[in-house]
Amino acid sequence: SGMDRVVLPGFYGATADGHVRTFSRGGSDVTGSILARAVKADIYENWTDVSGFLIADPRVVSDPKVISTITYEELRELSYMGATVLHEDAIFPVRTAGIPINIRNTNCPDAPGTMIVSDDNDEVSGYTITGIAGKKGFCAINMQKAMMNSELGFCRKVLGVLEDNGVNFEHMPSGIDTMSIIISEADMEGKEQQVLSQIRKAVNPDHIEVEHGIALLAVVGRGMRRTRGTAARIFAALAHARINIKMIDQGSSELNVIVGISESDFAEATRRIYDMFINSVE
């Protein structure tokens, strides 16, 4: 077409019948991502009002550092746990095309911001972790039954009860005779007694209870794969603050460690982990 530059609207468009509709919040992020893929861009610059992703929530940690480089996989882990700068749907179009995203600040245009790169990128920061994120508002269904590990289909039956009631589970730590299911409080609202009754009928546990007021805190970073003792440092940071860990989960990718703690300990736990991995290395 001979055009060097094209300006397109990012937050509204036309429906199939020609009506103009505005997109939901973050819609322009998605538009930019789709256009970047369509023109096979070398990079997608997303200009916003922050200088990239921060290692921790600035409402909890004072003046947290900016993440210089983050992979798509790390970003998804942090976004799932509540870290938000870029609309989640804006990631997929450029991720599949291998196009990096640069988050930049319109109010501070000289700041390099954060580069979001492919998952096989070997570039790492000077820190073991990439980011810390978490959410409150979870509960745990704790079950105990003798010889649980020998009972065929126990887990399937419990999860079937949750599915029948439209309840999604987040994590499921277990032992030989114990099992806990971490669930969003919002999903359980108005369903708790019905779910417990159906679980009792399905698997007849020796003991079952619901523990409320749980927060989940995720420590994410590809640097953890090549660093020994990361989990030990997380636990030590919390132990020194006398914070009790209710649940531990680590994926096989070694990309993240998730701990369950009391909601009242959420802010302090975040600060202690940040101090352990960021402030202590400076």
Model-predicted regions and their roles:
Residues 1-282:
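C-terminal catalytic "cap/lid" subdomain
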